[in-house]
Amino acid sequence: MFGNLDKLYRTVTRTNGPLVLHFHVLHSYWLNLEEVVSFCQKVKAHKPDITFVWTLHDHWSVTGRCAFTDGCEGWKTGCLQCPTLSNYPPVKIDKAHQQLPGKRQMFRAMLALGCQFISPSQHVADAFNSLYGAGRCRIINNGIDVATETILAELPAMPEESGRPKIAVVAHDLRYDGKTSQQLVRAITALGDKIELHTFGKFFAICGR
């Protein structure tokens, strides 16, 4: 998207009929959020039948800069002093407090354009709605296409019910504290054979059933 906005603008505005422009993870070291919003405003003015959809996969939309809060609630009070400069995306100088008001104004501008915010995460949606208004972000859970996920066909037959509660922990990288807290790991370890644990992701800290 960001290689040539002019080219994308021409492609979008020359497309006949309604169009959906769907954003996912936009935050990175080079993202200019104001430029993205200006682009969307320009497109909407030229093509009123376009719809913007933005899927929120983390908390970047509510914080000054962090994608993961890691238990920090400073975003609720203006990100006055960031406790984790190494949190993704890492920085050398903390400017979250200065950037936060303008950043939130950009999200309000997207809402004014009719952007539909969605998230597969309840807690991400709750955080967004607490700032921008109830119902502004809707939940659409991630699904699995069982027709194409051949790994499912290779799974062994289900054993008899153990009677133990089943817990699933799902993340791309299970060793990252932003995805799997050490407090959760300790709590699961303490339960031992009282539960049946299933993990989906790499580098989990617990071995065994």
Regions found by a protein language model. Give the residues of each.
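Short N-terminal targeting/anchoring amphipathic segment
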Residues: 10-31, 48-57
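Carbohydrate-associated surface elements
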Residues: 123, 143
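A conserved nucleotide-sugar
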Residues: 165-167, 182-208
